């Protein structure tokens, strides 16, 4: 399993099970930290409250049903935003938004269920750390601390949003 942990800020091959959304950069190499630019994108999102370690499992069916009903191709990554977390928080968040990203932000869904929402995100700059291994909470916390340390060492950047994980496979 491989994923990125990122904060929005003002030659190993990855076998991905699906395509990246239009204009998305490739995943950050494992253990590397990189500043990246993402284009604007559209996503279908499921909001979850509870043990955030369960968020992706609980969100899968509603998100999959949405893309299936609307005949939208599956992409990678799956995005998880910890909406009640901050750049300096050390406690486990209790709210998450899990999103399937549309292949192209121009896709207009015809059928949106009451359990999901469709959101357009603007372009953003992030600092990203590449991670390879299990999607464990301890790995998230370890790599979050590394990103926080990187931000402290690079005062020209400031975290302006909640952390997000991009899960590639």
Residue map of PLM features:
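A solvent-exposed interaction/effector surface
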Residues: 2-169
